[in-house]
């Protein structure tokens, strides 16, 4: 079974919908990463991911820290993203969670299926890649 990978910001977490998200990130405030609303219904997503895990798939996270963030801020962003996952997808046992510096090539971390809102990441991925639209429909096809 292939690995399934999820980006977070703009894919499952609505970072860009948080009021004043960009000024807060520039001020190295990690709050928007925790405050981001889910971009889809988390209960059905968690249920589907757990079904796929039971069938032998691995479910993983590959997400970037903030662009231009200091090392300390990037550590805070990692913690904020882990907190977001614990709040919204606590029942999912992720095999791997990589929260890496902004711009790190995601294809260095895995293969299989990627859900990511950034076209560049989808194009360079080693496997099948989908955008953030219709995630549940794509998962149901597996």
Q: Which residues make up each language-model segment?
A:
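Acidic, Mg2+-coordinating phosphoryl-transfer loop and its flanking beta/alpha structural elements
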Residues: 112-142
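The start of beta-strands in P-loop NTPase/AAA+ ATPase cores
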Residues: 2-4, 111-112
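Structural alpha-beta junctions
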Residues: 53-56, 86-96, 126-130
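Surface-exposed, flexible loop/turn segments at secondary-structure boundaries
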Residues: 67, 105, 135
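Short, flexible active-site-adjacent loop segments at beta-strand->alpha-helix junctions, enriched
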Residues: 65, 103, 118-119
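Donor nucleotide-activated moiety binding/catalytic core segment of transferases
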Residues: 92-112
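Conserved beta-strand termini and adjacent loop/short-helix elements that scaffold enzyme active sites
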Residues: 62, 99-102, 130-132
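Alpha-helical substrate-recognition element adjacent to the catalytic core
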Residues: 3-88
């Amino acid at each position: 079974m292939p690995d399934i990978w999820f980006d977070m910001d703009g894919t499952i977490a609505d970072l860009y919908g948080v009021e004043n998200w960009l000024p807060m990130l520039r001020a190295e405030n990690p709050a928007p990463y925790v405050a981001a609303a889910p971009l889809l219904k988390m209960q059905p997503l968690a249920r589907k991911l757990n079904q796929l895990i039971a069938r032998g798939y691995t479910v993983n996270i590959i997400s970037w820290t903030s662009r231009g963030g200091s090392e300390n801020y990037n550590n805070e962003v990692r913690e904020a993203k882990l907190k977001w996952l614990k709040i919204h997808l606590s029942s999912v046992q992720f095999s791997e969670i990589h929260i890496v510096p902004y711009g790190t090539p995601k294809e260095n971390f895995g293969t299989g299926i990627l859900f990511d809102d950034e076209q560049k990441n989808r194009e360079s991925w080693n496997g099948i890649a989908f955008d953030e639209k219709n995630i549940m429909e794509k998962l149901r096809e597996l």
